[in-house]
Design a protein with these regions (language model features):
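ABC transporter nucleotide-binding domain
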Residues: 98-185
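Conserved ABC ATPase "signature" region
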Residues: 22, 26, 34-52
């Protein structure tokens, strides 16, 4: 059985959590009232929502709604759960709480996480894949993949007027404005530009290098 939490899902704002969860359990085929009551208490407790069961869903915070979404995804004891952008828009406290919840669930259920937030991958995933245009480009353990880029990532500040030419002649992983200049990260076996320093690779480097189709042959 498959459980699914989409990035955006509708909740009836004037219905309380207990009522909607019971309704969803019925829709998923749990017809026995006693079984539904036990399941509802178990899953709402697991997601730390039991004490809020009588509150209307329209009063829930973004993180509480996400936790309710995970609870409903667990109805029916699924063996696989797909979670789409679960921490998008959450504040740091709720993101941390949600990470802990997913880690706990992942001990007993296979969780497939679809996300653009690199912290989700580094904190939660034992295995990862980077997909572009429907094709899997990279797959493996996050830390092992990052380790392959050790000594390959360089960083430095350049003038904005020089950036275009540098990007043309070097494998620029990513760039951002900093103090009126451009802070760039470059993929190279050797010091690409005088004054650049070697830096520890991050998952974000792997992601941008893959998406930007930089030459990773021999590195990954």
């Amino acid at each position: 059985i498959l459980g699914y939490l989409p990035q955006e899902f509708g909740l009836y704002p004037k219905v309380n959590a207990l009522e909607l969860f019971d309704h969803l359990a019925i829709m998923k085929g749990i017809s026995n009232k006693s079984d539904r009551e036990k399941l509802t208490k178990s899953l709402l407790s697991q997601t730390n929502l039991w004490k809020y069961r009588n509150r209307k869903l329209g009063t829930f915070s973004g993180g509480m709604k996400q936790r309710f979404g995970i609870a409903q995804a667990l109805i029916g004891d699924p063996k696989l759960i797909i979670v789409d952008e679960p921490t998008a828009g959450l504040d740091p406290t709720e993101r941390n709480r949600f990470h802990n919840l997913l880690s706990e669930i992942g001990e007993n259920v296979i969780v497939i996480l679809s996300t653009h937030i690199v912290e989700d991958v580094s904190d939660l995933c034992g295995n990862m894949a980077i997909i572009k245009d429907g094709q899997v480009k990279v797959v493996g353990e996050p830390q092992a993949l990052i380790k392959e880029l050790t000594t390959q990532v360089w960083t430095g500040l350049v003038e904005k007027k020089d950036f275009k030419n540098i990007k043309k002649n070097h494998q620029v992983i990513s760039s951002r404005l900093s103090m009126g200049k451009v802070q760039i990260r470059v993929l190279d076996d050797n010091e690409p530009i005088a004054g650049f320093s070697q830096t520890s690779p991050e998952i974000e480097d792997l992601y941008f290098a893959t998406i930007n189709e930089l030459d990773l042959k021999g590195k990954i």
